[in-house]
Amino acid sequence: PFEKQPFEDFESLVHTNYLGYVRLIRLVINDMIKNKSGAIINMVSGSTLCDPVPRSFIVYSSLKVGLKAFCKGLFWEMRDHGIKVTSILPGVTDTDLTGKLKEVTADTSRLMTTEAIENALKFALTVPANVCPLEIAVINQQTPWTAPVIPFKQEHPGK
């Protein structure tokens, strides 16, 4: 629960799930502007589509909603420079991270494969030059996030 998580965990989430993206984009954006081309594709999160936000994902989902808004704003700033900005919103996908989602991993047949996300990425990169898919939501037909609560045990290094 939010009230029991150490503040340091929130800071870590901010650096990983928001500021890391912004810093990386800042490293490349001026060269893209100079070249008048490029594509910025951010893996945001399908959790931005959840209402209500699943328990234990409040801070994470809030940061991802912020990242999605940042990407939309960046699209409007960069489109006249020939730079595309796309947010991919993947649902629960079979990765090492999903091993920490207790309820979700009980039935792995409900999880998407990384191939589905790869296909979304390919789509974003192969649309015509005058088209930019602003957001691509890739959600499993029976995604576990339709459930209102997903128990999540976050591992803390050194604890």
What are these regions (language model features)?
Residues 24-28, 70-71:
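Hydrophobic positions on the long internal alpha-helix
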Residues 25, 61-63:
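Active-site helix of classical SDR
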Residues 45:
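Residue(s) in the substrate-gating loop at a strand-loop-helix junction
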